[in-house]
């Protein structure tokens, strides 16, 4: 029977006999004495085997990396000069008396402590990859976060209630994962993109405070922070307004960070969506970076420089400046790389001005401003740019001029890239946790492809008080009772006050050009139940995977999920998704179009 975990044996166990079980992390033969570093989930302990115990010595001699061993022995101090203060077990070792080989191991595809392994190799051999200490730490922290959430919400009176995994398809937003029904041929379930409607119905049912930590599914293109199946910390409350919900969830975030990382998140300032977009070009600004946009659209309406004037006069266009302190030292190569970078976001180029002498703001050859565009701008405009940005000698000013969406995304991304690469050395990056709430989101945004307004969050979000009539008369300026929790440039949680009246919900559907017939077909169960005395309610959902990625500093969300999918939505460990045989398809009343075409051609 195991008496101790390897990594937790310290000096308090000196002269005691212990039994440990684990994997051979490393084996060394030093002049007839064998040393084994035995590893389990808590860490490593050094085991010494000498020839005086011949059976144990023979077992140790046959063992290789990743063999599974049971070792019994006496704890003693390590010899002077061989201790490791970074480990709990670093001052002791076990002198083995008995060793049992519980299982042999084939040569692993990579060494457990090898950090230079491609992600494909890691994901194909995920079980071995999960033995690595970094992965063990990540998943342990994930567990601690989940348990902290449960403890906090339980203390706040929330009830953990499961909602269905097989539900109906309501294709608003991302694509659903569909599950064919065998007993109802030609009909399909959908895997939930969120428990949104069910948790609202639980409020109508009178449960008052609900939560669950649950899987959600979205069939969408993947990025570094996205997975087709992801875990959500989901909660909903009745009779609370947005301030009260934000207070509860802010308290939860603070408690979880304190318990798991011993970090005090401090205050959560609130920033209107319009301000976030105006100064940072993003609805999830990274406040560690002290760089802001400067608005120049009005100034450029009277300039002759076509690139800026065209964007300023364009419907929905924008011209902004981004001042970077001490950026005049950027090389031509660096600026070219930044130009290529903003092109990813649709920018056609990246204009800049290096500020060498603010005392000479002419547009002539002797100007204190260095740039190919200086000669195309009036001296008044140059002075105004320097004044508005507050630029000083040694700075560089980057410009964005295009449709507002392109400018916000391109210069917003540039702000992050420059801030992370140069901010720490130049005083405009603070390496600490910077949370905030982004509030007052627009209710709708215009989708040019669909030629209609769509919901910014989802169609069940309530309009801001006094904005109900704007849903139809002026949807572009209608604000929502929505709020996002943002931390270091990541949206870690999003929520809203919901619509609790059926007539208001029907108006929102109408504003989204969802016909009464379609409303009843897709959402009739919601509309019908809202008529039975639905309480005012609202909630919020946190992305657990994203939150733990941020807390661990992992490079990818895949590093905090035990068995993740690749960016092509595949599991390399099990080779999923996979084809199924014709019998299974027939049972589901399905036929593959490609196979049918091949059969017809034959």
Curated annotation (Swiss-Prot):
It is found in: Cytoplasm. Signal peptide: none annotated. GO terms for biological process: aspartyl-tRNA aminoacylation. L-aspartate binds at residues 172, 218, 457, 498. InterPro entries: Aa-tRNA-synt_II (IPR004364), aa-tRNA-synth_II (IPR006195), aa-tRNA-synth_II/BPL/LPL (IPR045864), Asp-tRNA-ligase_1 (IPR004524), Asp-tRNA-ligase_1_N (IPR047089), Asp/Asn-tRNA-synth_IIb (IPR002312), AspRS_core (IPR047090), GAD-like_sf (IPR004115). Its EC number is 6.1.1.23. It catalyses: tRNA(Asx) + L-aspartate + ATP = L-aspartyl-tRNA(Asx) + AMP + diphosphate. The gene is aspS. Belongs to the class-II aminoacyl-tRNA synthetase family. Type 1 subfamily. The record marks 30, 81 as: Important for tRNA non-discrimination. Residues 196-199 are annotated as: Aspartate. Keywords: Aminoacyl-tRNA synthetase, ATP-binding, Cytoplasm, Ligase, Nucleotide-binding, Protein biosynthesis. Aspartyl-tRNA synthetase with relaxed tRNA specificity since it is able to aspartylate not only its cognate tRNA(Asp) but also tRNA(Asn). Reaction proceeds in two steps: L-aspartate is first activated by ATP to form Asp-AMP and then transferred to the acceptor end of tRNA(Asp/Asn). It comes from Neisseria meningitidis serogroup C (strain 053442). This is Aspartate--tRNA(Asp/Asn) ligase. Homodimer.
């Amino acid at each position: 029977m195991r008496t101790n975990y390897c990594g937790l044996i310290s000096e308090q166990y000196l002269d005691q006999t212990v039994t440990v079980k684990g994997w051979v992390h490393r084996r060394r033969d030093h002049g007839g004495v064998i040393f084994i570093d035995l590893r389990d989930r808590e860490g490593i302990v050094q085991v010494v085997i000498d020839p005086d115990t011949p059976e144990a010595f023979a077992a140790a001699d046959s063992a290789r990396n990743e063999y599974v061993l049971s070792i019994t022995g006496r704890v003693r101090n390590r010899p002077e000069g061989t201790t490791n203060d970074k480990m709990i077990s670093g001052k002791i070792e076990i002198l083995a008396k008995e060793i049992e080989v519980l299982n042999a191991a084939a040569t692993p595809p990579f060494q457990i402590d090898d950090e230079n392994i491609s992600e494909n190799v890691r994901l194909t051999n995920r079980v071995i990859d999960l033995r690595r200490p970094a992965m063990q730490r990540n998943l342990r922290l994930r567990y601690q976060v989940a348990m902290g959430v449960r403890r906090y919400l339980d203390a706040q009176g929330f009830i953990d209630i499961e909602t269905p995994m097989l539900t109906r398809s309501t294709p608003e937003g991302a694509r659903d994962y569909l599950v064919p029904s065998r007993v109802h041929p030609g009909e399909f379930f959908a895997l939930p993109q969120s428990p949104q409607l069910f948790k609202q119905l639980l409020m109508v049912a009178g449960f008052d405070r609900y939560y669950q930590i649950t899987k959600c599914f979205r069939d969408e293109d993947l990025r570094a922070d996205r997975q087709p199946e992801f875990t959500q910390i989901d909660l909903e409350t009745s009779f609370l307004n947005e301030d009260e919900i934000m207070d509860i969830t802010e308290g939860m975030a603070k408690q979880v960070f304190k318990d798991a990382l011993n970090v005090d998140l401090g205050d959560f300032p609130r920033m209107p969506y319009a301000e976030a977009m105006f100064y940072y070009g993003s609805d999830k600004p990274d406040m560690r970076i002290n760089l802001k946009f400067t608005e120049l659209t009005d100034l450029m309406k009277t300039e002759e420089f076509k690139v800026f004037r065209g964007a300023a006069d364009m419907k929905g266009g924008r011209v902004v400046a981004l001042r970077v302190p001490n950026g005049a030292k950027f090389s031509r190569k660096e600026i070219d790389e930044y130009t290529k970078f903003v092109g990813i976001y649709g920018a056609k180029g990246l204009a800049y001005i290096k500020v060498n002498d603010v005392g000479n703001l002419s547009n002539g050859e002797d100007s204190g401003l260095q740039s190919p565009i200086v000669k195309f701008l009036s001296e008044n405009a140059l002075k105004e740019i320097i004044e508005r940005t507050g630029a000083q000698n040694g700075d560089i000013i980057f410009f964005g001029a295009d449709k507002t969406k392109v400018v916000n995304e391109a210069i917003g991304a540039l702000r992050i890239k420059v801030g992370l690469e140069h901010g720490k050395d130049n005083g405009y990056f603070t390496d600490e946790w910077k949370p905030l709430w982004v509030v007052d989101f627009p209710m709708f945004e215009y989708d040019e492809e669909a030629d209609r307004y769509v919901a910014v969050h989802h169609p069940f979000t309530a309009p801001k008080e006094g904005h109900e009539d704007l849903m139809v008369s002026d949807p572009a300026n209608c604000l929502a009772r929505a709020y996002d929790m943002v931390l270091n440039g990541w949206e870690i949680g999003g929520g809203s006050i919901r619509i609790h009246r059926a007539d208001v919900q029907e108006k929102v559907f109408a504003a989204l050009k969802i016909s009464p017939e379609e409303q009843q077909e897709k959402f009739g169960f919601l509309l019908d139940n809202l008529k039975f005395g639905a309480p005012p309610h609202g909630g919020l959902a946190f992305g657990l995977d994203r939150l733990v990625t941020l807390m661990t500093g992992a490079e990818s969300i895949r590093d905090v999920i035990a068995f993740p999918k690749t960016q092509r939505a595949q599991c390399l460990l099990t080779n999923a998704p996979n084809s199924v045989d014709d019998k299974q398809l027939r049972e589901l009343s399905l036929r593959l179009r490609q196979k049918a075409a091949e059969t017809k051609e034959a």
